[in-house]
Amino acid sequence: MKPRTTLRPSRVGAPALEQGRDAFRKQAWGEAFSRFSAADRKSSLTPEDLVSFAQAAFLTGREAEGADILSRAHQAFLSRGDTQLAARCAFWLGFTLLINGEFAKSGGWLSRAGRLLEGEPDCVEKGYLLLPEGYRLYQTGDPVAAHAKFVQAAASGERFGDKDLVTLALQGQGRSLIRQGEIARGVALLDEAMVAVTAGEVSPLNAGGVYCSVLEACGEIFDLQRAQEWTSALEKWCASQPDLVPYRGHCLVRRAELLQLHGAWPEALEWAERACELLSQPAPKAAVGAAYYQVGEIQRLLGRFAESEAAYQRASEWTKTPAPGPAQLRLAQGQVDAANAAIRRIAEEVRDAGPRARVLDAYVEIVLAVNDVAAARVAAEELCGIATRWDVAFLRALACRARGAVLLAEGNANAAIAELRQSWGIWCELDAPYEASRVRILIAQACRELKDEENARLELAAARQTFQRLGATKDLTRLSAIWPGQFQSPGPLTEREVQVLRLVASGMTNRAIAGKLKISEKTVARHLSNIFTKLDLGSRTAAAAYAFDHNLV
């Protein structure tokens, strides 16, 4: 959102207004909002200053105030006879409401913008109005028509030299092409949009929106390298604007997803919970749901089933998009029939290839648990088809694991090992220790079918070591069930908790432990809480005594 006319001198001569304008130019959003507020209390602001005031409000998380101020700018432009700029304000009010899921209010403002422009010559504001049309088509399952709208919008932006419109339209085109399965073309357009953003050619509100959209797309197509690169870029961009409130939550969710994949679960949980806190302020409903869903995923992997269920429930309050996590939770709890019913229903609902790939991965595991090998075979082949079309490493790893699991269930252990070895290798390349260890369990089972007890034992031992380090308690329990008596009990503490306990026993403070292990003090405190609970201890002194008694120091 940006005015396309040069700021007119205000009738207000107070220093606060000039200070507000200066702070706005410097992207000091908190100061800009404060100074504009002071100037606004003394006298009326120009419409252009009201637009800047509104942007400062939005960028500091004051969404309701920002909308009120922008509606004032809309009225001020109308009073001055600037129909196109009044329409632009109405557009931004409507589009923001649309993104946030407030469809009735959104429709009212967008209709007003369209009506104002009916008698106007071709202008960039008419190009902007193509964006919500494209967005609606995309959301309602017509990416081809959506792409056409975004192409028209980009052409309008080019005609009028409006970088914001061009960039927003490019990311819309990219997302629409990806939804059509044209991954390479779509990603190229997203990269082009990001070039404009990282070069500083796009206004902050729109830059943040493009960052979040591109990161969401990376997640949809499982492009981990791009997700890592653009997440780091978004973190730096947010850090350069300390007062910035929107977009930080989205950034934390993506960072949590990457940390989870790479096995840093306590840190991932901390980032995901921080995202929930940040996104509890006005934010798109899907973003809040994604944050809580991520918390649920990590808690499930850690074996904290009550906490996982609570987080999944919170996620469902914000988004109705079905996801496999709750069904996987039921499987982990031993409620196999409930898991089977849930995943079959979800598979009927989710049709888009990206989200469906995750559903199919869970589907294969769950239906094999109820011995429906035929259904698992169909799902595995569908997943392999998606992986072949998209040619993404993450999907290839999922597909090989699914096919290997089905072959193992069908009694073809040799063929299963070949598929599973491919999956394991890809997970290792992606630095995904948990996923790699899940495959190792399947390889061990295949080796056992072939009477290769030695290699089966080695695979299980390696998987057990990783699960213990990660704190994957449910998987450790599953290991013991698969091969009873093979291993001694790993004890109640994870490897990381043992590290923390040793350092506590040596007399280190939480801050010192955090520095040594390169984790946050909050994570150290969480580990200590788990240690006290698992060992039934009440103090650091008792924990230190336990460490000495059990030869941990």
What are these regions (language model features)?
Residues 12-38, 42, 59:
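Alpha-helical segment of the N-proximal tetratricopeptide repeat
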Residues 19-25, 51-63, 87-103, 125-142, ...:
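Tandem amphipathic alpha-helical repeat scaffolds
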Residues 29-30, 63, 83, 103, ...:
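TPR-repeat structural position
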Residues 33-41, 71-82, 95, 111-121, ...:
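Amphipathic alpha-helical segments of tetratricopeptide repeats
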Residues 52, 69, 459, 527-530:
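Residues within the DNA-recognition helix of helix-turn-helix
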Residues 393, 405, 409, 413, ...:
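Linker/hinge segments immediately adjacent to helix-turn-helix/homeobox DNA-binding domains
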Residues 418, 461, 484-538, 542-553:
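Helix-turn-helix DNA-binding segment
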